Amino acid sequence: MNAIPTIITERVDDIPLLLEQMQRMGLPTLFDTHFPTHGNWTGLSLGWVSTIWLSSMLSQGDHRMVHVEPWVAKRLWTLGTTTGQMVTRVDFTDDRLESVLRRLSHDERWGAFASGLHQHTVRVYALSPERVHVDSTSAKAYATVSDGGLFQFGHSKDYRPDLPQVKVMQAVLDPLGMPLATDVVSGERADDPLYRPCIERVQASVGRHGLL
């Protein structure tokens, strides 16, 4: 008697495209290299958890942790086939994602990670780093101002000094517009002191001077 086949139905959407692009960028390996875990870590590596989590954010347009585990549970075959990994829903519980965030919140390691990512991207895609554009902007919001928080009152480029804002400094590779460095700081900060740290990080990551 012939066995009855098992039919699995999942929404694929843009997940394979996103994950393939992230693998070409070397994200899983870069995450694992620059944000190592201890011996008690089991299951999917931090690099793959982070990469699949990013694909969820981009595909769903939602950064909230609470939706990640059920999203993964409905796409186990798609995620496992695309990544070649043994993916389970327990790799994406709130506790596991909080553990990932704690390890990723390390400024010095982020600098090394960004440097490795930019060098890999420029090399693999044969980009020509001839000119880098550095500039800042601000984003206003109906947010509550708190001591030490990101949203603060400052000089408003949007002509809304009554609203708190957050400030973003970014360096991008011209003319492609690929981000090379991004700093998010509180809204009362002046622009001038933000340029030099951003420029120095770009120079370190691409290994060249005279681009700015």
Predicted features along the sequence, with ranges:
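Dynamic "connector" segments at or just before major functional cores
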Residues: 1-152, 162, 169-188, 195-196
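Hydrophobic "anchor" residues on beta-strands that sit immediately upstream
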Residues: 131, 211-212
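Short, basic/hydrophobic alpha-helical segments
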Residues: 192-211
